[in-house]
Amino acid sequence: MAKNLILLGLPGAGKGTQADFIVKDYSIVHISTGDIFRANLAENTELGQKARQFMDAGDLVPDEITNAMVADRLNQQDVETGFMLDGYPRNEAQAVFLDKYLSDNGKSVSATLYFEVADTLLRERLLGRGRADDTPEVIDNRLAVNKAANLPLVDYYQKAGVLHTIDGGRELADVYHDVKEVLDNLN
């Protein structure tokens, strides 16, 4: 059975690293909304053109456009064996859209992996990246904004019965051991 996953967690929680392990071991397609946006912009698709208008104005791209881009990507053949969404959904409205879209296509979210890491460790990891724009103030703001966005999604998927909270503050191998345990027990 296809494994359809959502990765949640604050910046620095290790989602990308764990996603790489999952792709390697489970042959699941990793779908990043950033990649979807870049592809639509580069290919100058109709959705890309619409998104560009908002982005050029410094505005957030509306859910309808983001949802349409994700739906278009989920229609592609390579996701039949399973997919892993990273960076989507970003809010409860997008989560509701995704559930309906998947249901309409005979699919569902198999599991939502929420990587939980203490703020102090997240801050330390992000500062350790050495990016010029990663000042303590910027990092604290990014964590606060992302926490406000993540908590309703954690609650949404908890109520849906598909949330698996994983302690992302440990060694990579220990975190991945827990990820594998969840994935290997999905029906």
Swiss-Prot record:
PROSITE patterns: ADENYLATE_KINASE. Residues 32-61 are annotated as: NMP. The keyword Disulfide bond does not apply. GO terms for molecular function: adenylate kinase activity; ATP binding. Pathway: Purine metabolism; AMP biosynthesis via salvage pathway; AMP from ADP: step 1/1. AMP binds at T33, R38, D59, L60, V61, G87, Y88, P89, R90, Q94, R131, R142. It catalyses: AMP + ATP = 2 ADP. InterPro entries: Adenylat/UMP-CMP_kin (IPR000850), Adenylat_kinase_CS (IPR033690), P-loop_NTPase (IPR027417). One of its GO terms (cellular component) is cytoplasm. ATP binds at G12, A13, G14, K15, G16, T17, R129, R170. Keywords: ATP-binding, Cytoplasm, Kinase, Nucleotide biosynthesis, Nucleotide-binding, Transferase. Its main location: cytoplasm. Catalyzes the reversible transfer of the terminal phosphate group between ATP and AMP. Plays an important role in cellular energy homeostasis and in adenine nucleotide metabolism. Consists of three domains, a large central CORE domain and two small peripheral domains, NMPbind and LID, which undergo movements during catalysis. The LID domain closes over the site of phosphoryl transfer upon ATP binding. Assembling and dissambling the active center during each catalytic cycle provides an effective means to prevent ATP hydrolysis. Belongs to the adenylate kinase family. This is Adenylate kinase. The gene is adk.
